[in-house]
Curated annotation (Swiss-Prot):
Known catalytic reactions: L-methionyl-[protein] + [thioredoxin]-disulfide + H2O = L-methionyl-(R)-S-oxide-[protein] + [thioredoxin]-dithiol
Name by which UniProt lists this protein: Peptide methionine sulfoxide reductase MsrB
Keywords assigned by UniProt, alphabetized: Oxidoreductase
GO molecular function: peptide-methionine (R)-S-oxide reductase activity
Length: 143
């Protein structure tokens, strides 16, 4: 992963690097996926690991893509974040150790969680491209 990660880091734009590597936050309502409605999955921009599904995406009116849950809990790590004078729960990708965003206890659904994720940390794979992009095992989500 180290060589792959180094290669992928060099391919990131400034915002993607700032968010994923320096725990940055992109501007609300001015990012690629905040209002994105196409069916598919969102993967870690660095590792390519599947993180979230459009089926779990909802409009939280916060300006960032929001999800009720990750695709697989094993790929998302939570960490206490005491920056900016508050205590929050940071969300990171386990494989690439990239900053993704934060999770808050104010979401809809049975778990009541809102995963507020930076678009800059994600790559979207449309459901019709899952097989072609190597995520064919997740096609069943959209049947």
């Amino acid at each position: 992963m180290t060589n792959d990660k180094e290669k992928r880091l060099k391919e990131l734009n400034r915002m993607q690097y700032e968010v994923t590597q320096n725990n940055g936050t992109e501007p609300p309502f001015q990012n690629e996926f905040w209002d994105h409605k196409e069916e598919g999955i969102y993967v870690d921009i660095i590792s390519g690991k599947p993180l979230f599904s459009s089926l779990d995406k909802f409009d939280a009116h916060c300006g960032w893509p929001s999800f009720t849950k990750p695709l697989e809990d094993e790929e998302v790590a939570e960490k206490v974040d005491k920056s900016h004078g508050m205590v929050r729960t940071e969300v990171r990708s386990k494989t690439a150790d990239s900053h993704l965003g934060h999770v808050f206890p104010d979401g809809p659904g049975p778990n009541g969680l809102r995963y507020c994720i930076n678009s800059a940390a994600l790559k979207f794979i449309p459901k019709d491209d899952l097989e072609k992009e190597g995520y064919g095992d997740l096609k069943h989500l959209f049947d």
